[in-house]
Amino acid sequence: TLMFEEEVVERRLAFKPDPELGNLCMGIINDVRIDIREVPLLDDKGVESTWEYAGCKFPVLVIEFKQCKTDANPKDRYYTFTAKPVTTLNKKGEPVEEKTVINIIQQVYGQLRHIANQFKGLKGYPVNAGKCPGLDYAAPAKVRCEQYLAFFEYFKHLLVGDDEKNPIYKNVKLFMKLVADYNTHKFLAFPSFVNRGFVERVIPGQSPSIEFEAGETIHLAKDDTPKN
């Protein structure tokens, strides 16, 4: 007899800006991993997919943060930052302007370098990691996926170090600036551009230097404050 238990899926709460920190958040990195997603050649209807990464092993760098609890905010709260290979074709299959592709890649690099820089000087930080692997945005999709995998592994190594069981990031507190998503204003996320910073290692006795830029807000659409 086959017995089936219903899987209980809990909705994870999002980070909540802390008024005591000027609406910044304080959190730690909870997990860093690379997910490899096999992209099917056929879509849901059995039609050959026109997406440029169809048939590829598509790497996704996942950095999961957990908010530090306070008396006013005692619940488990998470924020997940992901970095993916940049698409070079639009939905019509037309090439995206080269300048735009380069800007998006540099934006992702800037975000990852900024996060990794917060761990410089800590025990285990790989000072001999060398240069970040390059990306040829004009290469075939499968080659690009391999290059992105090396690119993401480089940054994972900067955050984790050589000892996966005792990662550099473990229990390192960070000030974090999460803002309403620029396009939808429906969720909080890191800003696309580093500017004066969106993450900063907490140093006892020092106030954060991160500030909100003009146009950045924590207020979400249909509501004045993040839910829960």
Annotate each language-model stretch with its function.
Residues 1-228:
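Short beta-rich binding modules
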